[in-house]
Amino acid sequence: MKAEYKFREKITDDIVDAHETIRVTAKALTEGKIDKASALDNLARALKKLESAKYYIERG
Protein backbone atom coordinates (compact mmCIF):
# COMPACT_ATOMS: atom_id res chain seq x y z
CA MET A 1 0.00 0.00 0.00
CA LYS A 2 1.42 3.36 -1.00
CA ALA A 3 1.37 6.08 1.57
CA GLU A 4 -0.83 8.98 0.63
CA TYR A 5 0.93 12.28 1.10
CA LYS A 6 -0.39 15.70 0.14
CA PHE A 7 3.15 16.78 -0.64
CA ARG A 8 4.33 13.70 -2.57
CA GLU A 9 5.83 15.71 -5.44
CA LYS A 10 7.71 18.08 -3.10
CA ILE A 11 9.06 15.16 -1.08
CA THR A 12 10.17 13.32 -4.21
CA ASP A 13 11.82 16.43 -5.65
CA ASP A 14 13.73 17.12 -2.44
CA ILE A 15 15.00 13.54 -2.17
CA VAL A 16 16.00 13.37 -5.84
CA ASP A 17 17.78 16.75 -5.60
CA ALA A 18 19.67 15.65 -2.47
CA HIS A 19 20.66 12.34 -4.07
CA GLU A 20 21.95 14.06 -7.19
CA THR A 21 23.89 16.65 -5.18
CA ILE A 22 25.53 13.95 -3.07
CA ARG A 23 26.35 11.82 -6.13
CA VAL A 24 27.91 14.70 -8.07
CA THR A 25 29.83 15.95 -5.03
CA ALA A 26 31.22 12.49 -4.30
CA LYS A 27 32.32 12.08 -7.91
CA ALA A 28 33.99 15.50 -7.93
CA LEU A 29 35.79 14.70 -4.66
CA THR A 30 36.99 11.37 -6.01
CA GLU A 31 38.31 13.06 -9.14
CA GLY A 32 39.86 15.94 -7.16
CA LYS A 33 37.75 18.51 -9.01
CA ILE A 34 36.20 20.22 -5.97
CA ASP A 35 37.69 21.85 -2.90
CA LYS A 36 36.65 20.84 0.61
CA ALA A 37 34.75 24.04 1.35
CA SER A 38 32.61 23.68 -1.77
CA ALA A 39 32.02 19.99 -1.06
CA LEU A 40 30.87 20.78 2.48
CA ASP A 41 28.59 23.53 1.17
CA ASN A 42 27.05 21.14 -1.36
CA LEU A 43 26.54 18.45 1.28
CA ALA A 44 24.97 20.99 3.65
CA ARG A 45 22.50 21.92 0.89
CA ALA A 46 21.71 18.24 0.34
CA LEU A 47 21.08 17.81 4.06
CA LYS A 48 18.67 20.76 4.02
CA LYS A 49 16.77 19.11 1.15
CA LEU A 50 16.50 15.88 3.16
CA GLU A 51 15.33 17.82 6.22
CA SER A 52 12.72 19.50 4.05
CA ALA A 53 11.51 16.12 2.78
CA LYS A 54 11.31 14.85 6.37
CA TYR A 55 9.27 17.90 7.37
CA TYR A 56 6.75 17.30 4.57
CA ILE A 57 6.56 13.59 5.36
CA GLU A 58 5.73 14.41 8.98
CA ARG A 59 3.10 16.93 7.84
CA GLY A 60 1.72 14.17 5.62
Model-flagged regions — what are they?
Residues 9-60:
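Short, charge-rich amphipathic interface segments used for partner binding and complex assembly
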